[in-house]
C-alpha cells in the first residue's frame, strides 16, 4: 500500500480540526486563558561551572526599514519571511548568562530594568533570576558589554538604588566615559546618556575598568569589539578547558546580520566599524568553532556559528534538560 498525504487530505484534516475546536468552545471557556508567559531561565554546564541564562524579555524593534541599512528593504523582508519570521516586526530576545564559578557568581549585562523605552515586554531579569533561585545579593560581579540601556538598565531599581548590593561592576572605560558624559545631554544621544548616568553613576565607586585582552576575572577575558559603541566588548568565558564567547551586541540578529554581515544597524555608533568588527571576530569564532552565547538571538541564545560563501550561519544548540 502506498503511503501518501495529498494536499486535499491535509486541507480536509485542517477543516476537521477547526470544526472540533468550535464544538469544544464551551468546554474551553471554562478554563480562562492566562494571557501571559512566565519568567524563564535555562541551565547548562561549562567545565566546572554552571551557567544559568536568564531572560529580560523581548525587545520589539518594529519594521526593519530604517533599522537594518544597506540592503534593500524588500530583500530584508524576504530574508525574514524565508526564515518564518515576521517581515513587519523584528523582535530581539535579551539573554543574560550568570556563571557560577564556585567562588563567584558573574552576571553578564542587566537588561532594561524598569525602563519601558522599548515597550512592556522587557524588564523581566529580576523575575527570571528569582524563578531560577538566584538572589540579587548572590551576584559578585556584573560584567557589562557596553552602556546601552538594554544592557545596563537593570543596575538600579525603581528607587534608583543599586539592585546588586555585593557586586563589583566591570566595563570598558571608553564606554563609561562616552555614555556618562554630561556634555552629551544636549545632543541626539540624550536618552541613552540619561539612562547610562542613572545606572552607572550610583555604582561609580564599585566600577572596575578592564583592558582589551585582559583576563580581569578568573575565566573571563575581554575582547574589544568597537563599532556598536566605542568601548563595546565581547567576552571569552572559560572553565576547565571549556569556553564560549558572550557576544553582547556584536550581532543583533541571527539571520540578517549573519547572512549579510556588512549590513548596517542604525543603533551602531559607527556602523562601518561595527560591520568590520563583526566580520573579523565572527571569522575567528567560526574558524575556531567557539560556541557562542548571544544576547539578542532567539532564546536561550546559545549555539554555533559557521562561515558560508557570503556570510555566516547560526546553528542553535539543542536545549539539554539533563545537567
Short names for language-model regions:
Residues 38-132, 234-251:
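Conserved beta-strand hairpin/beta-sheet module of binuclear metal-dependent hydrolase folds
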Residues 56-57, 110-113, 147, 174-175, ...:
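Active-site metal-binding loops of divalent metal-dependent hydrolases
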Residues 153-160:
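Metal-dependent catalytic neighborhoods of phosphoester/phosphodiester hydrolases
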Residues 1-21:
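N-terminal secretory signal peptides and thylakoid transit peptides that target proteins
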Residues 30-32, 123, 128-134, 138-150, 178, 194-202, 206, 213-215, ...:
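Metallo-beta-lactamase
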Amino acid at each position: 500500500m502506498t503511503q501518501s498525504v495529498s494536499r486535499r487530505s491535509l486541507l480536509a484534516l485542517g477543516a476537521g480540526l477547526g470544526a472540533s475546536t468550535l464544538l469544544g468552545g464551551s468546554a474551553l471557556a471554562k478554563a480562562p486563558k492566562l494571557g501571559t508567559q512566565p519568567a524563564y531561565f535555562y541551565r547548562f554546564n561549562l567545565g566546572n561551572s554552571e551557567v544559568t541564562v536568564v531572560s529580560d524579555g523581548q525587545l520589539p524593534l518594529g519594521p526593519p526599514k530604517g533599522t537594518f541599512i544597506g540592503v534593500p528593504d524588500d530583500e530584508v523582508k524576504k530574508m525574514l519571511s524565508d526564515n518564518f519570521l515576521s517581515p513587519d516586526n523584528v523582535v530581539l530576545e535579551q539573554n543574560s548568562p550568570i556563571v557560577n564559578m564556585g567562588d563567584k557568581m558573574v552576571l553578564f549585562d542587566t537588561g532594561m530594568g524598569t525602563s519601558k523605552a522599548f515597550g512592556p515586554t522587557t524588564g523581566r531579569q529580576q523575575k527570571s533570576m528569582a524563578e531560577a533561585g538566584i538572589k540579587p545579593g548572590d551576584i559578585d560581579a556584573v560584567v557589562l558589554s557596553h552602556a546601552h540601556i538594554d544592557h545596563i538598565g537593570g543596575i538600579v531599581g525603581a528607587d534608583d538604588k543599586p539592585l546588586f548590593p555585593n557586586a563589583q561592576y566591570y566595563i570598558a572605560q571608553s564606554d563609561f566615559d562616552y555614555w556618562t558624559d554630561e556634555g552629551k545631554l544636549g545632543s541626539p544621544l540624550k536618552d541613552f546618556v540619561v539612562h547610562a548616568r542613572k545606572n552607572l553613576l550610583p555604582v561609580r565607586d564599585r566600577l572596575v575598568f578592564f583592558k582589551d585582552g585582559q583576563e580581569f576575572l578568573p575565566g573571563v577575558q575581554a575582547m574589544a569589539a568597537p563599532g556598536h559603541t566605542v568601548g563595546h566588548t565581547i567576552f571569552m568565558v572559560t572553565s576547565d578547558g571549556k569556553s564560549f564567547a558572550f557576544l553582547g551586541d556584536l550581532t543583533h540578529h541571527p539571520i540578517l546580520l549573519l547572512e549579510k554581515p556588512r549590513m548596517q544597524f542604525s543603533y551602531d555608533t559607527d556602523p562601518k566599524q561595527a560591520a568590520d568588527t563583526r566580520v573579523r571576530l565572527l571569522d575567528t569564532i567560526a574558524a575556531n568553532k567557539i560556541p557562542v552565547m548571544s544576547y539578542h538571538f532567539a532564546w536561550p541564545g546559545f549555539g554555533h556559528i559557521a562561515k558560508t560563501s557570503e556570510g555566516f550561519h547560526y546553528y542553535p544548540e539543542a536545549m539539554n534538560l539533563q545537567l
